[in-house]
């Protein structure tokens, strides 16, 4: 008999969003589950054998039915900061043994196998947070990340890995920014695409979430987001489109919020017209937990499964079918979509390998490698880093989390790690007994300052914990900021390591010589950060979102924009999100999108652009190719992320961002080594959404192609007409 938490279930959400490219030999897909496919035929045959009551019983989750409110959700997640088990509940669709239909079990997963149907929660590999994965700018790392997610999903007896989230970081204050891939739709699409490949290549279903524009936690159950069509198409939908067209993603999760007055789970335009119609999605759509608000409107609007309960798709749906408000053929199609995916992934096969032991050591090592690639060196005056082991005899390590790994953010993505390596443990692993360590939690500032004065090196670690269920101020506490300033004044060799889930204000930036953004590195936290500090790993991470100097510099800087007035949030900034806004308004960010330093230097030479494909190629067809030589001009090996931006012709009638990301390539180079780097530019990147024709249209005129190491650090400029 299953036991589960009896605390009133104010159901959290199950985040999910995923994208993919069809490139793994064993990469499973769901978009071929049509009537003509084997899986589709089997699904249709199965549904033909079911009674109406059996059909309806399969259209909702097994949790008790209940309503949710914004206030109750906020309270739940506040309490869950201390006790994540409060988020546990049934996360499955029950089996029908007489028809040999297995239970479909779901698990949260942006940072690894998180909260699921098992109680107590299973331990799993605590991967670096997805925002850290985005900071790698490495599609191979994204695929490996997905392989760990997918394999552990199967090993822990689940079918559906609810990951990754692909909502754009419109506001850095968003409580779930750490679960997704930053502020740019192109970077988000590419990282998510390969993440899906990894998940589905291991036999688990991936989920594209949260469809669409789930960009804030404040009033998330009811907020109405007013978004113009061009902005929706160019900023908030591209990653989902790629999930369907390239990734053949198994499922899509509908979001909590309304878009232009209509809840996502009953939004016929989003779910039927765009997702299933225009994009040809053949998988199934299910609601985020508690995101269903109607029976008939949702059934006709494209929602195939209500989770986690049957508040609207239980008895109410049965009544609606019997009364003729919803045709039985409509619910047949709902089931066929989900069963076809289950057949495609082999979940009706009794011989499919399910359940087993997680290889903790091997997966932990892979998690560490990904996290090491994600670390961003933001500042490094006078080459303070890497630390030279032979020159250091005393260390002062200061911070209230130095004895605890930053394994992840809060909410339904919470992972119970198989093990953790603390920051202080990681440093001791590198330096051993040859260095004397003094530690302080920083609460006694005078003690911390005295300690720092005596040390050869002072390291201050600041954590800013963010969680689903509430938005956050992107500031450290006054006590934390004061601590940094006083320690830095006491020791000119002070290194600050910040661990955040988003960008953050840094009022003391001019007073510290070295700064590292480590995000939430996962279970290997201590080893990851230490390996960067001592130079065993050369930092190569790049920011997936801009760091502002002050809050008023952000794109959504009015109450009408965020969090909204009277539950309405107006996206009046349009397409000018993140660095697009900073560039358009000539605002200098503290650190620009794409920024990240290295312990070596790189030189860009001999750029060349050539035309490929046709004038009006399909969205992902290569239209241009840019090539250039990149040389490591330093004396240590390193990796550079070469970034390609486009400046499209802009007019008053059709404003364009000053630059937008259209390609990138991570390249590893030995000292003195040169490699010819080739970056494709897709046809979609040369296009805009034409609101008159309701279609993508190629821009006319001269295009500037800029290649550099960040959106503000350009090393090569080409023109193309």
What does each model-found stretch correspond to?
Residues 2-11:
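Bacterial N-terminal signal peptides that target proteins for export
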Residues 12-20:
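Bacterial N-terminal signal peptides
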